[in-house]
UniProtKB/Swiss-Prot annotation:
GO terms for molecular function: proton-transporting ATP synthase activity, rotational mechanism. Belongs to the ATPase delta chain family. One of its GO terms (cellular component) is plasma membrane. F(1)F(0) ATP synthase produces ATP from ADP in the presence of a proton or sodium gradient. F-type ATPases consist of two structural domains, F(1) containing the extramembraneous catalytic core and F(0) containing the membrane proton channel, linked together by a central stalk and a peripheral stalk. During catalysis, ATP synthesis in the catalytic domain of F(1) is coupled via a rotary mechanism of the central stalk subunits to proton translocation. It comes from the Bacteria. Gene3D superfamilies: N-terminal domain of the delta subunit of the F1F0-ATP synthase (1.10.520.20). The gene is atpH. PANTHER family: ATP SYNTHASE DELTA CHAIN (PTHR11910). This is ATP synthase subunit delta. The keyword Ion transport applies. F-type ATPases have 2 components, F(1) - the catalytic core - and F(0) - the membrane proton channel. F(1) has five subunits: alpha(3), beta(3), gamma(1), delta(1), epsilon(1). F(0) has three main subunits: a(1), b(2) and c(10-14). The alpha and beta chains form an alternating ring which encloses part of the gamma chain. F(1) is attached to F(0) by a central stalk formed by the gamma and epsilon chains, while a peripheral stalk is formed by the delta and b chains.
Length: 177
């Protein structure tokens, strides 16, 4: 099985835990330190040893990390050592960073209407776009009287046109063909 495939559930679990406990930055630094420690040839030899018990490997690794790990970080290292997965820490860090990037990315959605939207309408549109795009959404509301009624939603190249002007233009195109 691929190291990335094995690493993904660990990275996802750590990421979800970090989000839930609002400790993403500290987990990022713990994983970064532990991953750098893996690049040490002596540590790498220790981690791949079949003679030393998993518990002893975890104890040594945690001792070397010192105060760089909190209680949750130490528990994570123990779980990784028990399952003989400490060599996967660089891959786990890589996936964790990808999840952080994806989570922090916010997509801008432009909403064009004839009149100002109410707070309730803004909340409904934001929620619908968040569900559809599976990302955080930032709404930019624009007032344009030329659309007559309805709204136009722009998400990058995608345009959802439910304006009266758009409908009239489509009707005109349909009638002229």
């Amino acid at each position: 099985m691929s190291e990335i495939t094995i690493s993904r559930p660990y990275a996802k679990a750590v990421f979800e835990f970090a989000i839930e406990h609002n400790t993403v930055a500290s987990w990022q630094s713990m994983l970064l330190y532990a991953s750098k420690l893996n690049s040490n040839p002596y540590i790498a030899k220790l981690l791949s040893s079949t003679v030393i018990t998993n518990t002893k490997i975890a104890d040594i690794f945690i001792a070397v990390c010192g105060n760089k790990l909190d209680n949750y970080g130490r528990n994570f290292i123990r779980i990784m050592a028990y399952n003989r997965r400490l060599l996967l820490l660089p891959d786990i860090l890589k996936i964790f960073l990808q999840l952080c990037k994806k989570n922090s990315s916010t997509i801008e959605v432009e909403v064009i209407t004839v009149s100002a939207l109410t707070n309730n309408q803004i909340a409904q549109i934001t929620q619908a776009m968040r569900q559809r795009l599976s990302q955080k959404v930032k709404l930019n509301c624009i007032i344009d009287l030329s659309i007559i009624a309805g709204m136009i939603i722009r998400i990058g190249d995608i345009v959802i046109d439910s304006s009266m002007l758009g409908r009239l233009e489509r009707l005109g195109t349909h009638l002229s063909t």
